[in-house]
């Protein structure tokens, strides 16, 4: 059976791996997942990521980050879901924890953080929040 929400699956895998104190987590790859991983790396929430080919299928491997033995990501949640998409204009994109966290937004200019979307004056689909 096909997966109904691959992005939620990705976020859940990251959350579960960090709770289990794993060094890395692997999942099926897609362009959107790679873009989300790139934003997480740029914002300092993960160490690194790489796309690896295994048996003709691309897998995304994310190296998780810890500080003083605790996961750097305290909270990671899906906002826009397949059954209820959430689109926001550039002025309405939510600030996560008053700017301490980030909202990851899919815009016509690509996947980016809420701050970059506001600076670029572009809105889009609010994929998830990370704090």
UniProtKB/Swiss-Prot annotation:
Q: Which GO terms describe its molecular function?
A: rRNA binding; structural constituent of ribosome
Q: What InterPro entries does the annotation carry? A: Ribosomal_uS8, Ribosomal_uS8_CS, Ribosomal_uS8_sf
What's in the keyword line of the UniProt record?
Answer: Ribonucleoprotein, Ribosomal protein, RNA-binding, rRNA-binding
One of the GO BP terms on file: translation
Q: List the disulfide bonds.
A: none
Give the top-rank taxon of the lineage listed in the UniProt record for this protein: Bacteria
Pfam families documented for this protein: Ribosomal_S8
Q: Which GO terms describe its cellular component?
A: ribonucleoprotein complex; ribosome
Q: Specify the signal sequence span.
A: none
UniProt keyword annotation of ATP-binding present? no
| NCBIfam families to which the protein is assigned, alphabetical | PRK00136.1
The UniProt similarity line reads: Belongs to the universal ribosomal protein uS8 family.
PANTHER family reported for this sequence = 40S RIBOSOMAL PROTEIN S15A (PTHR11758)
Q: What is annotated about its quaternary structure and interactions?
A: Part of the 30S ribosomal subunit. Contacts proteins S5 and S12.
> What role does this protein play?
One of the primary rRNA binding proteins, it binds directly to 16S rRNA central domain where it helps coordinate assembly of the platform of the 30S subunit.
Q: Provide the protein name.
A: Small ribosomal subunit protein uS8
């Amino acid at each position: 059976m096909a997966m109904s929400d691959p992005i939620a699956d990705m976020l859940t895998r990251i959350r579960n791996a960090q709770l289990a104190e794993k060094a890395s987590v692997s999942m099926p790859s897609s362009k959107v997942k790679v873009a989300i991983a790139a934003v997480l790396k740029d914002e300092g929430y993960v160490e690194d990521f790489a796309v690896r080919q295994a048996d003709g299928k691309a897998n995304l491997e994310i190296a998780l980050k810890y500080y003083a033995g605790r996961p750097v990501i305290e909270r990671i949640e899906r906002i826009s879901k397949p059954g209820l998409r959430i689109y926001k204009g550039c002025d309405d994109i939510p600030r996560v924890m008053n700017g301490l966290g980030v909202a990851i937004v899919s815009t016509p200019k690509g996947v980016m953080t809420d701050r970059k979307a506001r600076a670029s004056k572009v809105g889009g689909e609010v994929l998830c929040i990370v704090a």
